[in-house]
Amino acid sequence: MIAYEKLQQELRRSPRKWLVTGAAGFIGSHLVETLLQLNQKVVGLDNFSTGTPENLEDLQSSLSIKQRRQFRFIEGDITSETDCKRACRGVDYVLHQAALGSVPRSFADPLSTHLANTTGFLQILLAAQKAKVKRVVYASSSSVYGNEKKLPQKEEKTGALLS
């Protein structure tokens, strides 16, 4: 049995409560869907700055009524201490996907990018700490590996950094 199958069995056996930030984004919405299909409780937090309501609507069709009831969505912002505290309440694990992820955008609007990607991340960490969350998983960007063409990219070999 592969590790992913073991993890799926463990999650089904012992459900947990998860917070997915950036829940309306491409990756976030797929994480929400997968967790709900594994009968987990999920809180989604998103401000729709880059994610879309359609991503959340699309996942509904693959879920049972019971699974849909296990999802609570908060339209809020990771830069808001109040929103982060509310989202982290009662959560076991945080999957932090929320970010403004475009290198060109970061040059065009460095303050908004910094606020979301740095201050927002810190707000999530502080709220998670106060809520006694067991673990926060942070999603980085493949841009940190630079423009290396060979896949898979490896940490020890980088091209010209993109961010």
Task: Write out the residue ranges for each language-model feature.
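N-terminal Rossmann-like NAD(P)+-binding domain of SDR-like oxidoreductases, especially those catalyzing
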Residues: 1-163
